[in-house]
Swiss-Prot record:
Listed GO MF terms: DNA binding; DNA-binding transcription factor activity, RNA polymerase II-specific
Name used for this protein in its record: Oocyte-specific homeobox protein 7
Gene: Obox7
Keyword annotations from UniProtKB, A to Z: Developmental protein, DNA-binding, Homeobox, Nucleus, Transcription, Transcription regulation
Disruption phenotype: No visible phenotype; mice are viable and fertile. Female mice lacking maternally transcribed Obox1, Obox2, Obox5, Obox7 as well as zygotically expressed Obox3 and Obox4 are infertile: embryos arrest at two-four cell stage due to impaired zygotic genome activation (ZGA).
GO cellular component, one term: nucleus
Pfam families: Homeodomain (PF00046)
């Protein structure tokens, strides 16, 4: 048989190289495969699925998986706590309500207040029936009115204190005696020495005063 055209020696070598490399590659992979498997983490179907998902999809899956656990961690409010809160709100609303008395009712209450600021239980019940309110409201009115009158009395006392201080100061100035009598000139132009008042002592006069007193007596 006729042989085909012979290739150049360089081309023949080049064509043989891939065959040798391809024959060597599987052998090297077979040698290194146990080492790579020991170094690389275990690959599971779930991990491959997670790696194939994008980042937003992973976050969404994590939130969905964590959602039930968070909801299960929240404890429902007890009935006692709910009843307590509703009771507090009801008491606050009740406190805000204020009874407005008419002029006639105020006159009646004021009349009894002027008679007695601390009425007895029987009187409180009668007033509550007359006005149409509860006993607690009557007691509260008397209590508030007593506090108002005490405050008014304190203000009157404070206003009266400065006036009393001024009058006492004027009295003290008018009754204040100096330690010595001022010098008085006599008829002939000679000055007379003043007498001094010592503590727990009798007034002392000089000779000229004694002589003038003696002449006056004569």
């Amino acid at each position: 048989m006729a042989e085909g055209p012979s290739l150049h020696p360089k081309l023949q070598v080049a064509s043989n190289i891939p065959i040798e490399i391809s024959s060597q590659i599987p052998q090297e992979l077979a040698k290194n495969l146990p080492f790579q498997m020991s170094q690389s983490p275990l690959v599971t179907p779930g991990s491959t699925m997670q790696s194939s998902l994008s980042v937003p999809e992973r976050n969404l899956l994590q939130q969905e998986s964590e959602g039930p656990s968070r909801q299960s961690g929240c404890m429902p409010l007890s009935d006692k706590y709910v009843n307590k809160q509703t009771g507090l709100l009801a008491s606050r609303n009740f406190r805000k309500e204020r009874i407005v008395y008419s002029k006639e009712q105020q006159r009646l209450l004021q009349k009894h207040f002027d008679e007695c600021q601390y009425p007895k239980e029987k009187k409180i019940v009668e007033l509550a029936v007359l006005i149409g309110v509860t006993k607690m409201e009557i007691k509260k009115w008397f209590k508030n009115n007593r506090a108002k009158y005490r405050q008014m009395n304190l203000q009157n006392i404070k206003q009266a204190l400065p006036e009393s201080n001024g009058s006492s100061k004027a009295v003290s100035e008018s009754t204040h005696f100096p330690g010595s009598i001022p010098v008085v000139a006599s008829d002939n132009g000679e000055s007379i020495c003043s007498g001094t008042f010592g503590e727990d002592s009798i007034p002392k006069f000089n000779c000229s005063q004694e002589s003038s007193l003696y002449c006056f007596q004569a």
